[in-house]
Design a protein with these regions (language model features):
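Soluble acyl-CoA-dependent acyltransferase catalytic core bearing the H(X)4D motif
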Residues: 1-7, 26-36, 46-53, 60-330
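Generic start-of-chain signal for non-secretory N-termini
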Residues: 1-23
């Protein structure tokens, strides 16, 4: 049986109406070199339809257990409808960057349908006045639930869909994995019995681990308590640190972006020995955030912190399902 593991299931159980846990990727395409034979929506739909076996996420949905007694199962969607998942829309005139960002914001604000495979792909046409792109450019907006994959896997999957080859490395690895996936979930009674057994095993394993690591756990709890007390005191001394990013969440999301030459990012990274392009992008985003808060008079004295997902897969590893990430605070 292929069951959602604990790390992936967390993204399901944490989801709320105001904080959905899906992720998305945006790709922009310049098709001016194609002349009188541009890419059409029907071509993209057919191309994706022929590659649904590249990963189980495309045709499997999540089946939750009664009362969430256990982690959910991945099961085949017997009513799979490609037209529900691959959609087509166009920007209103004049089709500029602002309208594109508004459209992406609306799409990302909508939760995924949990009764279907947890992904959607939008072909967005009408990008006629986006600086740096010619008329008739288009974009792909790909949205997938975080319980199915992280952004690194999503990027690899979407890139594999661009291949004209039927047997890429990604296709080969995923086809081997698909052979072991169930087509149906267990019956409700069986799911309950499995849940009781699995929870008993997990509890026993946790007790054994806790017994062998009690001294280490005690030290961790002590240090954590001290740190929390220090943070509380520092927070009181520093005064009100609230800004527009520390307010209660709503379901609405805002997307914005800009373009930088890759060489500029590489040159920026070389200014600090050992720095990578990721470090350079973090520095750019951090400075942009500082300037934004400063403009609105909300910079404050308390540093703004964010969480950064880091890919922890081994080099060369391919996994078109699940999450293999660590969370760093920056």
């Amino acid at each position: 049986m292929y069951q959602v593991d604990s790390e992936d299931a967390n993204f399901l159980f944490m989801e709320k109406a105001e904080s959905p846990t899906h992720i998305s990727l945006v790709y922009l395409y310049d098709q001016s070199d194609l002349g009188d034979d541009p890419v059409r929506f029907t071509h993209i739909r057919e191309h994706i339809g022929n590659r649904l076996n590249s990963a189980p996420v495309f045709y499997q949905k999540v089946q939750r257990t009664p009362a969430d007694i256990d982690y959910p199962y991945w099961v085949d969607d017997k009513k799979f409808d490609l037209d529900f998942h691959v959609r087509h829309l166009a920007l209103p005139k004049p089709g500029d960057w602002r309208q594109f960002c508004i459209q992406v914001s609306r799409l990302h604000s909508r939760p995924l349908d949990m009764s279907r495979p947890l992904w959607e792909l939008y072909v967005i046409e009408g990008l006629d006045k986006v600086e740096g792109f010619p008329r008739d450019s288009f974009a792909l907006y790909f949205k997938v639930h975080h319980c199915a994959m992280d952004e690194f896997t999503a990027q690899e999957l979407l890139q594999s869909l661009h291949s004209q080859l039927a047997n890429t490395r990604q296709h080969e690895s995923s086809s081997q994995h698909i052979a072991h996936l169930p087509s149906n979930a267990p019956a409700p009674l069986e799911m309950v019995l499995r849940g009781v057994l699995n929870n008993s095993v997990r509890t026993l394993r946790l007790m054994l681990q806790s017994a062998s690591n009690m001294r280490t756990l005690s030290k961790i709890v002590t240090r954590l308590s001290i740190r929390m007390a220090q943070d509380a005191v520092e927070g009181e001394q520093s005064g009100d640190s609230s800004n527009r990013f520390s307010q209660p969440l709503s379901a609405a999301r805002v997307f914005e972006g800009t373009f930088y030459p890759r060489q500029l990012i590489d040159d920026y990274a070389q200014l600090v020995p050992g720095a990578t392009t990721t470090h350079a992008m973090l520095a750019i985003c951090g400075e942009a955030m500082r300037l934004y808060l400063e403009k609105h008079g909300e910079l404050g004295e308390v540093p703004l912190r964010a969480l950064l997902e880091v890919n922890v897969r081994n080099a060369g590893a391919h996994a078109l399902v699940g999450n293999r990430i660590a969370i760093n605070q920056v």
